[in-house]
């Protein structure tokens, strides 16, 4: 039997039985990306499939944007169960699926596709994955928190904001370098966040501000949870996400960056006496929820956690 390759291509997908027919298990799940070699999804999903007794292999597929629509159609012809989707395809897949969940529709992005006959069903597990991660890390629900999201204008930030709004968080502060993007998102989320039957507190429940220290300082007194939804922190030379002087012991800090495990933001939070966690738990839970979307049964989450941790060394 042949070894599973690190990455398969669009040309492979066009002749899927020829490209994968001699594998031990049929390759019926994948992750689409461009690039895709960095994806840790196979290290999570393949142990889970084995533990669940499902005869299936999960592989990486390098799909370029121009080939995306045809690649999605080929899934139906090649007996796929589904696929995950990573950069840069989440918006393109959103436009191509036949049906989608409410959270995917509101975010405008799909990261998980299930094949159902001749239909493609889209979901976004990044958003509910964040919800699960916050619960696991801090034993708190989004609905009970006043939340600041830094980088709300990006894809990860919008996913976080939509989930917080759908859960009716106590307060939502959207921070973005281009404040117009944060303001546009606030307008989209207004009806979810602003409850006419709920009395306003000492601060507005939905705010959009620029990514500037003075603007953030004005809001920080009325914030419990700070979420970094930017890529700032991946390099040691990166600037501060939040000025260290603004972080207080009562704050909860969640950094979606997970490599390095201890970013500057996490270090600053811990030095301030605040609880902090990196994005590894969100990566895990979005995978768990994707598995459950495909199979409509509980995923072996701890098996997936072990695979993910082993992939990181």
Model-assigned labels for residue ranges:
Residues 9, 14-139:
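Phosphate/diphosphate ligand-binding glycine-rich loop within oxidoreductases
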Residues 167-202:
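NAD(P)-binding Rossmann-fold cofactor-contacting core
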């Amino acid at each position: 039997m042949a070894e599973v390759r690190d990455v398969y291509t669009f040309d492979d997908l066009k002749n899927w039985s020829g490209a994968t027919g001699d594998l031990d298990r049929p390759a019926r799940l994948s992750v689409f990306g461009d690039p895709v070699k960095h994806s840790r999804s196979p290290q999570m999903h393949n142990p889970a499939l084995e533990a669940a007794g499902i005869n299936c292999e999960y592989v990486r597929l390098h799909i370029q944007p121009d080939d995306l629509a045809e690649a999605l159609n080929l899934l139906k012809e090649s007996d796929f169960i589904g696929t995950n989707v990573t950069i840069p395809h989440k918006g393109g897949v959103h436009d191509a699926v036949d049906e989608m969940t409410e959270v995917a529709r509101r975010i405008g992005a799909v990261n998980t596709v299930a094949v159902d006959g001749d239909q493609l069903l889209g979901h976004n597990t990044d958003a509910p994955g964040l919800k699960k991660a916050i619960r696991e890390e801090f034993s708190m629900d989004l609905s009970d928190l006043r939340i600041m999201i830094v980088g709300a204008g990006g894809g990860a930030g919008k996913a976080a904001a939509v989930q917080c709004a759908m859960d009716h968080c106590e307060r939502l502060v959207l921070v973005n370098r281009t404040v117009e993007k944060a303001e546009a998102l606030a307008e989209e989320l207004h009806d979810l966040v602003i409850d006419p039957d709920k009395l306003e507190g000492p601060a507005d429940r939905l705010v959009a501000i620029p990514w500037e220290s003075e603007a953030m300082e004005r809001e920080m007194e009325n914030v419990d949870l700070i979420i970094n939804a930017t890529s700032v922190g991946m390099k040691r030379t990166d600037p501060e996400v939040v000025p260290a002087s603004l972080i207080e012991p009562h704050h909860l800090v969640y950094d979606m960056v997970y490599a390095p495990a201890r970013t500057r933001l996490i270090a600053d939070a811990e030095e301030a006496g605040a609880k902090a966690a990196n994005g590894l738990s969100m990566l895990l839970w979005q995978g768990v929820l994707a598995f459950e979307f495909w199979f409509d049964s509980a995923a072996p989450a701890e098996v997936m956690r072990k695979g993910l941790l082993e992939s990181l060394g």
